[in-house]
Regions:
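Conserved small-residue
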Residues: 20, 47-50, 105
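A broad, low-specificity signal for short, low-complexity segments enriched in glycine/proline
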Residues: 25-29, 36-41, 73-75, 85-89
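Conserved beta-strand-loop-beta-strand hairpin that lines the nucleotide-binding pocket
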Residues: 1-9, 52-136
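Conserved ATP-binding N-box helix of the HATPase_c
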Residues: 35-59
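Bergerat-fold GHKL ATPase/HATPase_c domain
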Residues: 1-39
Length: 136
């Protein structure tokens, strides 16, 4: 089946990161996409961690997680209210202890990007290939 969508909202707090990961795992198992659980959970972990870290300076207190299954692609979107700085891929120095999240996202995804939201904030989107298994 194509065209499935799931939308969930979480508070901008560190406790939401594992909740968002578990939510993704539950949804993907329900959609018979269990083979994507690890990749999708890692992507969601990185994106929600970034939202919690940076969007706490924004005007809202929630993030939105959207999962979409369409045309052989799982689309993962994380939206928040922080609009002053858009995420960009960078290569951290070896001694830095953070800054590698988008490198992981880039390595796991077919494509990813960021777009501003209407009103305030941004959405970071990621396309993961549905390589095998699951409903088609």
């Amino acid at each position: 089946m194509s065209g499935r969508t799931n939308i969930a909202r979480f508070r901008l707090s560190k406790a939401s990161v594992p909740r968002a990961r578990e939510h993704v795992r539950l949804v993907l198992r329900e959609w018979k996409l269990g083979h994507l659980c690890d990749e999708a959970a890692l992507v969601v972990s990185e994106l929600t961690t970034n939202a919690v870290t940076h969007a706490a300076q924004g005007i809202g207190d929630q993030l939105e997680l959207v999962l979409r299954r369409r045309d052989g692609v799982l689309v993962v979107e994380v939206s928040d209210s922080y609009q002053w700085e858009m995420p960009e891929l960078r290569k951290p120095a070896p001694e830095e202890t953070s800054g590698r999240g988008l490198l992981l996202v880039d390595a796991l995804s077919q494509a990813w990007g960021v777009r501003p939201r209407t009103g305030a904030g941004k959405t970071v989107w990621v396309h993961l290939a549905v390589r095998h298994g699951g409903e088609e």
